[in-house]
Amino acid sequence: MTLQAPSAHDRNLPGLASLNLPPMFISEHCLRTLFYHGPLSPVELAAHWRVPQDVAVEVIESMKGAGLVEPDAGQTTFERHARVRMTAAGQAQVAQARQRTWYAGAMPVSARAFAEGVAAIALAPPDAATLRAALGELSIDETQADELGQAASASDVVLVTGAAPDEQAAVAQAVGGALPGETSLPFAIFAAGAVLRLFDPQRHLLAASDAAHDDALDVMRQHRDTASPWIAVRRPVVTLAGGVRASDVTPAYDEDARFYLAPPPLSALGGLLAVFDADADPAQLAELARLWLLPGKQGTGVVLVRSGERIEVPWRATTLLFAADGEAIGAAGAAAPYRVDIAALTPAALRGVLSTRLGALTPGEDLIEHLAGALADAGADTRVAAARAARYLLDLAAYQGVGGGLDAAVGRAVAYAEGASQRPPAGARRPRRA
């Protein structure tokens, strides 16, 4: 469901009161907008801020009374709808306003409006058929697919073990791609005296209703014909490669523009957050759990700003933690009620994985059967082992060319898959393969 702001509570309030923002911030936001764009009318300001026109009119009238703006030359006969420009007093105040932040896009929403708005959004569960089909292409059976789908329907945390490193992204995209519909988020929120920008054009794909606008991605300067500072987006899929870093759990501060940028977990609001190799840094993973995953059980996330202030925001997102095993993620395991192990492969699934991975070599059935049988005999019929064995043969073919020597290399590929190379002849030295 696409949300329209202001919230139900605020729609009953007149004019500026509907924004539930400090008057000083609204005044300075107007001055910053005029600084960037030059003279604008209340109608143009309302379109730029994505607020009702009566709000923009009230702001301008208030600022006229304070001597901060005046009608632009040749516009005095238009009374309340004239374009206005900053006076000398306004020019002096905008310099101070830009010391606090340079943000001059859509009007930020208050923390309360953000909470009420997110609560009003109904998220549809993933489509079971779509999810089964997408994961089936990765030789993940329906039971495991349904377990992932069940967790996603509750926006819960899942520990996924046994995935090969190079297929973690494919699993995440399969789950994220099965999340139907769209969600909404404000361009920015104002809390703790600071602006936090939520919309990120690199992470958020516009829904059809907003994508029709050519200026949709210009979050600093866009003009719109809607009275809502919320934007409709497809349900986001946000991924973190190489585990969690300290910068992934707290908002980044733009020193030049002087506002905060939403951290990846908050960008994933209403969608999917996936952490690849989550066990790479257990300490930072524990911090993700402390600020987002554990509070997320109550539908809350924690944003820490530079002042040390703690801002609690509404948060819910399906989270996939990919790790080698459940013990490797340490204390963060308490945040993951769902655990799906996709390591083991049936004989048919093993052949399917090998056939897909070796597709560039157009391998014959004999090679696939030979390799699958050798892996099974070695007790290495897992996703990671299959990926390593296939990688070995692909590397060999790239080096020596695709000839008749691949069958002879199966034994070495299996040894490599098990994490050990064949023992070199006595007295010989050979480099270790990473």
Enumerate the predicted regions with their spans.
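Conserved ASCE/P-loop NTPase catalytic core
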Residues: 139-321
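C-terminal alpha-helical "lid" subdomain
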Residues: 359-434
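Short alpha-helical segments that sit at the start of domains
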Residues: 3-29
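Hydrophobic residues on short alpha-helical segments
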Residues: 27-34, 87, 94
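Interdomain "pre-motor" coupling segment immediately N-terminal to P-loop NTPase/helicase cores
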Residues: 54-124
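Dynamic helix-loop-helix/coil hinge segments at AAA+ ATPase domain boundaries and subdomain interfaces
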Residues: 118-145
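Short acidic, hydrophobic short linear motifs in intrinsically disordered regions
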Residues: 36-48
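Conserved AAA+ ATPase core "coupling" helix
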Residues: 283-289, 315, 328-361
